[in-house]
Amino acid sequence: MVRVLCLLVFLLPVLAWGQAKFHLESFHGRQGYVLENERFRVTALRGGGHLAEIRFKSEDAKKSVNPMRVPHYQTIEPYQYVPSKHDALYSDSPHRWLSSGYMGHLLCFPSFGPPSSDDEVRNHLGNHGEAPIVEWKQHRVDYPPGEVKLWYSAELPKTQFRVERAVTVRARESVVHVEEWVENLALFDRPVNWVQHATFGPPFAEPGKNVLDVSATKGEVGPSNSRTNSLQAGAAVVWPNGTSRDGKPVSLREFQAPGKSGTYYALLMDPARPTGYFTMYHKDYPVLIGYLFPTSDNPWIGDWQENQSNTSLPWEGKVVARGMEFGTTPFAEGLQKSIERGKMFGVPTFRWIGGRKKVKTSWTAFLAEIPPGFAGVEDVRVEPRRIVVRERGTGKEIAIDNTHPTF
C-alpha cells in the first residue's frame, strides 16, 4: 500500500505536466477558445475563427512572445459589426469588416483580396471573403489520449458555404495541427480562392530583424504603388533574391527595412516537395515559428509586408506586420481577377469545388527554441514522431516532438 501511494505521489506531477486542456478565455477583449499544455498555448477566436495566439508559456518574456499580429487598436467580434456605430472606427471601405476583427492567422475564403465588383460591395461582401468575418461556433471538445481537439465551424450565408476546423494540441508538444473542411452548399460547381493568411506583428515582426525561410522557387512582385513599394513593382523573383525599388539586388529573407513602405510578392512553392514549409524568426528572440502544409493544396505563397504606409482607418500609419499567405492563389486581387488570370508559371491561380461537395485540407504550425546567432533554416523535414529543422550553413538540427500524424 505504501509503495502504491509513493508511486501515485511520483506520478501526479508527471500526469499533470502531460495534460492538454481546453477552456474559454477573453483575449484582448475577444472571445477565445484556448488549447494548451504545460509549455504551449493556442487561442482561436469566435469572431472570424482567427488563430490569434501561438506561443510558448514561459516566465522569460522573450521566449513567451506571441508571434501573431495583435492590432494596436481595439478589435470587435466582426459578426457584430454595425455600420452606424463602427464605420467611424474602422472606415466605410469594403475592408472594414475584416479590419474590425483582424488578428493573427485568418482564413481567406471563398475569395482572396477585394470584392470583385461594386455589386458585391453593395451586398456587404468585403476583403478576403466571408469566412474571416462570421461567427465560428464551438461544436465539441474531444480528449483522445494525450491530446485535446477543438471542433468549431461557421456558416457563410451570403456565399453559401460551410467551413469547419478541428484544432489539435498534444501534451508536451509545441505543435498545433489544423484539419479544415469546406462544404459547397450550392448545387453547382464553383471556383474559389482558399488561402491561409498567417499574420505576424510586433515585437516579433520588425523590419530588418524578422527573417523568413521558405521552400519556394520563383515568383513575382505585385504591381502595387511604386511610391510606397519597398521592392520594384512587377519584378521577377528567384527565391531568395529580389530587386529593391531603386533597382538594386536585395535579399527577401529579411522584412524590408525602408520606412513608410510595404510590399507584396508571390512565390511558387517547390512542386517536387509533397510538404511545403515556411519558417520565421526574429534575430533578437529565441523563438522560431514554422508552418507545414501539403504543396498540392497550396501551390502558392505570398509575402505581404506593411511598414506604416497605410494611413487609412483604422491603420493610421501605425501598422507593422508581415503576412505569409499560402493557398490556391498567388495575388490578393479578388476571385474574378484570379479566374481571369487563370494560370501563372503554368500553375492554376484558383480551384474548383463541386456542387454539394465537401473537401478537406490540413496544415501544421510549430514553435522551436533557437540559439543566439541562429543563421536561419536550410530545410524542414517530417520524421516519425518529430519535425526536424536544419540550420543554414552549420547543418545543425533542432528536433520538435510531433506525435500527431502530419497530412
Predicted regions and their residues:
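Bacterial N-terminal signal peptides
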Residues: L5-V14
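N-terminal secretory signal peptides that target proteins for export/translocation
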Residues: M1-V2
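Surface-exposed acidic/polar loop and edge beta-strand patches at domain peripheries
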Residues: Q19-H177, F188-F407
